[in-house]
């Protein structure tokens, strides 16, 4: 993704932590979104003042509030510097409200790089996404890009690319990498290893719950569904019944060729 996002922090708060610094950009191109962070404005009567954008909306995450304009190109996060969860959550709302208009999805998944392409392990928390990613790292030297949240973008060439994101959950994996997607894999814990391609309703049932499809503005969810439909028509999806050892790597490797 070539879009640039600029974050301005007018009070002491290191928004760009060790992981966020991987995504810092020093380019001079005009940004597609401006997002600023300011301290809450609460008077002595406990009344809070928030900025207002004509036709825009306000979103509360934890103790922070995001006020954003109609097309999600400009916004302000009002919060205290110690509300990390709220500030990061508001930033995600602002960013994704912009990206979903640009053929981009957010998928709950672990992303690895193998031979210049991305393999995405997706599924509910605890299913073994990061475990499978780490097995590929251990046995095949695959690089783990992100262990929790991945951007998926349809580029100008019509291909779908997976992009590392600054949001990484409890995972320590958080790299700024963009790769064409080779496959989406839905792991299931098992005593044996079996893999098969899935399609139709089963494919949708396995992937749909892991894609963030908000309803923040008119047509928002429909935009996301359109991009998801294109993704599932372009990228193979596999169900991997797997163990927590090298056999799982070998089974998937054989299937992918």
Predicted features by range, described:
Residues 1-125, 135-145, 150-257:
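A noncatalytic interaction/capping subdomain that flanks phosphate/NTP-handling catalytic cores
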Residues 129:
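Conserved lysine of the Walker
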Residues 132:
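Hydrophobic positions on the alpha1 helix immediately C-terminal to the Walker A/P-loop
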């Amino acid at each position: 993704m070539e879009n640039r996002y600029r974050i301005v922090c007018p009070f002491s708060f290191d928004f760009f932590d060790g992981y966020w610094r991987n995504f810092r950009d020093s380019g001079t191109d005009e940004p597609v979104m401006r997002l600023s962070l300011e301290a809450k404005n609460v008077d002595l009567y406990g009344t809070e003042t928030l900025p207002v954008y004509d036709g825009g909306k306000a979103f509360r995450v934890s103790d922070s509030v995001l006020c954003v304009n109609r097309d999600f190109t400009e916004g302000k996060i009002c919060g205290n510097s110690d509300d990390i969860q709220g500030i990061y959550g508001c930033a995600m709302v602002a960013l994704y409200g912009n990206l979903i208009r640009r053929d981009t999805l957010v998928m709950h998944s672990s992303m690895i790089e193998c031979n210049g392409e991305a393999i995405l392990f997706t599924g509910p928390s605890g299913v073994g996404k990061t475990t499978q990613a780490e097995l590929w790292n251990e046995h095949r030297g695959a690089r783990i890009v992100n262990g929790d949240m991945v951007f998926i973008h349809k580029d100008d060439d019509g291909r779908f690319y997976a992009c590392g994101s600054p949001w990484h959950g409890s995972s320590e994996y958080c790299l700024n990498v963009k790769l064409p997607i080779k496959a989406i894999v839905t792991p299931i814990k098992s005593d044996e290893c079996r893999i098969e391609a899935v399609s139709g309703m089963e494919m949708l049932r396995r992937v749909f719950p892991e894609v963030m499809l908000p309803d923040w503005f008119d047509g928002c969810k429909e935009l996301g569904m359109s991009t998801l439909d294109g993704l599932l028509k372009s990228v193979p999806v596999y169900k991997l019944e797997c163990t927590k050892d090298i056999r799982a790597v070998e089974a998937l490797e054989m299937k992918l060729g």
